[in-house]
Amino acid sequence: MSVWDPKEILDSIGLGKRTEVKRSTRVADAIRKELAVLLLEKIRDPKLQDVGISRVTATDDLTIVKIYYTIYGPHKHVKAVDKAFLAATGFIRSHLARTLNMRYTPNLQFCYDKTAEKVAEIENIFQEIAKERQDNGENS
């Protein structure tokens, strides 16, 4: 009769050992959280009202951070939001320097995240295919 060992069971399904997360991933996650707080509480620019941070990536040497954002609501004013982020970059970097306690604050690059639009396109294609199949099934 074998003794039940939870560590052995977790190891067998790949959950026993912690996987090490890269520092750049941890820093990117911290920056994403700080930016979310900044957008909600401190940045007063009306162009950034309907903006959310979808993901943040950082280079391994932490010199460049790419911040991907989405725009909620009916107005997709990407150029205006880009200009607003460009104007607020200094404020955002200084805030990140104070809160993250890093020796060097990375350069910030803001990029519009087109993932939501691509998902909507694919969903529309699937709906069209389903409608065509339904129409072909009725005509047969």
UniProtKB/Swiss-Prot annotation:
DNA repair listed as a keyword: no
PROSITE patterns: RBFA
Keywords from the UniProt entry: Cytoplasm, Ribosome biogenesis
Any one of the GO CC terms: cytosol
GO biological process, one term: maturation of SSU-rRNA
Gene3D superfamilies noted in UniProt: 3.30.300.20
Annotated protein name in UniProt: Ribosome-binding factor A
InterPro entries linked: KH_dom-like_a/b, RbfA, RbfA_dom_sf, Ribosome-bd_factorA_CS
Coiled coil: none
Gene: rbfA
Subunit structure: Monomer. Binds 30S ribosomal subunits, but not 50S ribosomal subunits or 70S ribosomes.
Function text: One of several proteins that assist in the late maturation steps of the functional core of the 30S ribosomal subunit. Associates with free 30S ribosomal subunits (but not with 30S subunits that are part of 70S ribosomes or polysomes). Required for efficient processing of 16S rRNA. May interact with the 5'-terminal helix region of 16S rRNA.
GO molecular function: ribosomal small subunit binding
NCBIfam families noted in UniProt: rbfA (TIGR00082)
